[in-house]
Amino acid sequence: MEPKVSVGILWNKKITFILNEAYLYEGQETSGENTVSFNDGKIVWNGSAYDELYFEPQYKDASFTIKDVVIGINFHWERKEDQEFQGALKLIVENETITAINIIGVEDYLTSVISSEMSATASLELLKAHAVISRSWLLAQIEKNREIIAQEEKYTTFIETEDERIRWYDREDHVNFDVCADDHCQRYQGITRANSNIEIVKQAIEQTRGQVLKSENKICDARFSKCCGGIVEEFQNCWEDTKFPYLVKLRDDDSTQDIPDLTQEQESIKWIHTRPSAFCNTQDKKILSQVLNNYDQETTDFYRWQVVYTQTELSELAYRRSGIDFGTIQELIPIERGTSGRLSKLKIVGSKKTMTIGKELEIRRTLSESHLYSSAFTVDKKDDKFILTGAGWGHGVGLCQIGAAVMGEKGYQYNQILLHYYIDATIEKLY
C-alpha cells in the first residue's frame, strides 16, 4: 500500500492560505482565503484559538495555495512565491510559530519533487532514475526518524570544544513532519511547477511506481547533489560517522582509470586545479537545462570555480556567519579531506582565535554569504587576498545530477545510471 508523507512547507507567525475547492475541517465544509496567526501558544483562526488545524480535501483533485512561501532558504536564489498543493493541510504550533504541513501520497509528492528538483525537460531515463532515488531517500528518512524517536537518545549533529566546531545538517530540525519542502531535504513545490511537461514526469513515476534502491535488505539513504566535481564523496565525510557500502568513492565516468587519493593535500590540489574528464564536466546548455531550473541557471560555473576575498572581507564574513570572533584571519589551513577532495575539517587561524570547523556544509556556510558551491577547494594567499579555487556543487555524495543527465543523453538506461552511482545496490518494488 502506498504510504503518505508529511512535508513542512512554511514557518511563520502569520500564514495566509486559500482553499481553492471545498475542504473539510471537523466535518464542516470550508473554502476561500483564510489567515491564521500565532498568539500565546495557540493558532488563532476566525477569532478562536486552536492547538492545531487539519483541513481534509473533499475531492481528490482539490488544492490549496499558501502565500509567500520562501524557497531556496539561505541560498543565493532565495525568494518568496505563492505555491499550490494537493492533499491535506495541517497547521501546528512549533517553536513559538505556526508550521504549515502538507500531507500527501508518496507518488504525488514525487511528481512534484521531480519537476521541482529537475527541469521537466529532462530525458525519461534521468527522470526515472530520479524517481527511484527520491522515493528511496524519502522512505529511508521516514524510517530513520522512527528509529531516532524509538531510541529516546538525543540525535546529535553538533560537537563543539574550545578549539573545534564540527556540525552536520541532516535530520535535526524535523520532529513534527517527515521532510521539509526546501533544498535541506528535497525541493518540493506542490503543483506550482508540476504543470510544465507534466506527462513525462508522470510517466517516469508510473513506470517506476514503488521501486526503491536496497542494500543489505534496507532501503538506501540515496543521497544526491548537483555536481560531484569528478569524484563522488562518501557519506561519513558529510554527515554522521556511518559508512554505507553503496555511498562510496567512485570516478564519475565510464573509464577504468585509477581514482586519485584526494584525502592527500597535494593530490587534491592537482585535481581541483585541472579539469579531468567526467560525466559532470559539461558546458552543454541543453543538458544543463534538464537539471538546473531557471533560478539555478543564474549559476554557470560549478565543475570548477573560484571565489576571491580580501583579508578584511573574509574576516568580517566568517565572524558574521559563524558568530566566532577570529579577529583578522591570517590562514585557512586544510586539515581533513574526503574522497572527492571536499574538506571535512578546516582550521581558521585568526589574530584573536584559532579554531577548526567542519563538516562540509558548516565550512561552506562560514565562508560565504549563502553557501560556497562546495567544500572541495584549495586556498592560495596573494597579497591581502584569499583565493579559493573549487570543484563541484553540493556535498557530492551519491548521484551526481549533472553527471546522470549526461548519462541519460548518452543512452544509458535508468537502472544503469542508478547502479553506476550506488555501488552494489539492487532495485526492488515495495508496492
Please describe what each predicted stretch is.
Residues 1-431:
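Conserved, single-site charged/polar hotspot
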